[in-house]
Amino acid sequence: MQVIRLAALSDNYIFLLHDSQKNIAAVVDPAEAEPVLKQLAQLNAELVAIFNTHHHNDHVGGNQQLIQNFPQLKVYGGAEDKGRIPGQQVFLQPGDRVQFTDRVAEVIFVPGHTRAHIAYYFPPQTADTPGELFCGDTLFAGGCGRLFEGTPAQMVESLTKLRSLPENTRVWCAHEYTLKNLQFALSVDSENTELQKRFDEVKTKRSQGIATVPSLLGVEKLTNPFLRWEQPSLQSAVNSNDPVQTFARIRGLKDKF
């Protein structure tokens, strides 16, 4: 399974999963249809599935046009998003499995950004290959999603689930927010040398127009303040020793950054 990253809108990423042997594809969070249709035409591939993480328009905006072009495809989303995802046919529960070609993804319930948000995790096929995590707007490179429908406690629980995955997991988040996220991270975790190093690397990449997605989960655990709420330096920065309160205060600062 090849993952093809497609740029969309102003800062979105759409992910096309392609099986070159069967010449079929699935798409994760099609913000718009045109980039997907263009890539499918280049591959001469049939689209068989849409995997939506949540209902926001910049993740489902392309659903209807893709359905019109490929009427046989199936649209997957969280069960609690029923009525909010265009064309949804499959209503996923936590722990469900979804299959694309020979790969099977675990459905992880990650409320916080929205009340129904899910992530799709494809475990590694061999010991030396990475797993693939499609996490929508729950976990970003260097950050996390705003809390529109969920609570800090829910988001901490959700991020704890994602944080427990193998460190070599590739994190395919849906936006190119990394540079600004790391600028904020330095404001609350300025002594973190791994973070300083990552910021410099990302700044160089973005100045050259290079994407910073995917990232590696192990790097996120060292540098992303929204996975580090137990760290004394971060707790001190927001004057709290409670993990959920620490997270909530960091999130509040980021909302105003």
From Swiss-Prot:
One of its GO terms (molecular function) is hydroxyacylglutathione hydrolase activity. Its EC number is 3.1.2.6. SMART domains: Lactamase_B. It catalyses: an S-(2-hydroxyacyl)glutathione + H2O = a 2-hydroxy carboxylate + glutathione + H(+). Keywords: Hydrolase, Metal-binding, Zinc. Zn(2+) 1 binds at H54, H56, H113, D137. Pathway: Secondary metabolite metabolism; methylglyoxal degradation; (R)-lactate from methylglyoxal: step 2/2. Monomer. Belongs to the metallo-beta-lactamase superfamily. Glyoxalase II family. This is Hydroxyacylglutathione hydrolase. It comes from Trichormus variabilis (strain ATCC 29413 / PCC 7937) (Anabaena variabilis).
